[in-house]
Design a protein with these regions (language model features):
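Short glycine/threonine-rich catalytic loop with a Thr-x-Gly-x-Asp
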Residues: 112-123
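Glycine-rich phosphate/dinucleotide-binding loop and adjoining beta-alpha-beta core of small-molecule
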Residues: 1-110
Length: 123
């Protein structure tokens, strides 16, 4: 199940997202489903497991991992994030990074930078 794009950032989406994360085994979280937890990050972290995938772009990433330095490489960023959560991470950007639950990292050098722009959606 995919949740997040265009969902809004209020209490309702947070409540729905929490319910889905508890009840649905395989979930992809993007956009609003991630950033609605910006004031309750520990709750988000606790709900993520090996069957969940988060797909932030850089701006969303720093909202859900505010303590991770912005001036380090994206590979270092996702490695630091992996210490906080137990899920898969797709960090969207000109070179999209994929960090699997088992800690393997794949770099997609062929992703389009236009698709990593806020609001472009996940095409």
């Amino acid at each position: 199940m995919l949740i997040g794009p265009g969902a809004g950032s209020g209490k309702k989406i947070k409540k729905i997202t929490k319910l889905i994360l508890k009840k649905v085994k395989y979930v992809v979280l993007d956009a609003d489903a991630l950033t609605c937890f910006k004031n309750d990050l520990q709750k988000l972290y606790s709900l993520l497991d090996k069957n969940k995938i988060i797909t932030p772009h850089t701006s969303e990433f720093h909202k859900i991992f505010p303590k991770i330095k912005k001036n380090i490489t994206n590979i270092k960023k996702i490695k630091e994030a992996r210490k906080l959560i137990k899920s898969n991470i797709i960090l969207k950007g000109p070179n999209t990074l994929i960090l699997s639950y088992d800690k393997n990292i794949v770099v997609n050098y062929h992703s389009s930078p236009e698709l990593a722009v806020i609001g472009s959606g996940d095409v």
